[in-house]
Amino acid sequence: MKKLANYLWVEKVGDLYVFSMTPELQDDIGTVGYVEFVSPDEVKVDDEIVSIEASKTVIDVQTPLSGTIIERNTKAEEEPTILNSEKPEENWLFKLDDVDKEAFLALPEA
């Protein structure tokens, strides 16, 4: 598992790379009230993926890896507070495929 600063986990699960919010980010932003996925399926490093509005701030999450978005947590658009959950199966943001393995390995360890 990789960790970007204090805000994003990246975990390789099978052939996919799952991106989720860290507990630090959840604490920093407060209760999530609005989520909008803004990216196309094909993304490059630093592309904005999702915009999150929470009680303490608004953030735009960018991807540290290039690849193809296979799945977005669209349930979070309907029920944004699930991103405040401690459960990984609820607080994930998106899943990438076609990722350069070396680029993933170069990310900081969690």
Swiss-Prot record:
Gene3D superfamilies: 2.40.50.100. Signal peptide: none annotated. GO terms for cellular component: cytosol; glycine cleavage complex. Residues 10-97 form the Lipoyl-binding domain. InterPro entries: Biotin_lipoyl, GCV_H, GCV_H/Fam206, Single_hybrid_motif. The modification N6-lipoyllysine is found at K56. GO terms for biological process: glycine decarboxylation via glycine cleavage system. The keyword Nucleus does not apply. Is lipoylated on K-56 by LplA2 (SAV0327) and then mono-ADP-ribosylated, probably on D-27, by SirTM (SAV0326). The mono-ADP-ribosylation state of GcvH-L might regulate the availability of the lipoyl moiety for redox reactions; ADP-ribosylation would inhibit the interaction of the oxidoreductase with GcvH-L when it is not required, thus ADP-ribosylation of GcvH-L might be acting to keep the response 'off' under non-stress conditions. Keywords: ADP-ribosylation, Lipoyl. The modification ADP-ribosyl aspartic acid is found at D27. Pfam families: GCV_H. May act as a carrier protein for the ROS scavenging lipoyl moiety and/or as a substrate for oxidoreductases such as SAV0322 and SAV0323. PANTHER family: GLYCINE CLEAVAGE SYSTEM H PROTEIN, GLYCINE CLEAVAGE SYSTEM H PROTEIN-RELATED. Lipoylated GcvH-L directly interacts with SAV0325, which reverses the SirTM-mediated mono-ADP-ribosylation of GcvH-L, and with the oxidoreductase SAV0322. This is Glycine cleavage system H-like protein. It comes from Staphylococcus aureus (strain Mu50 / ATCC 700699).
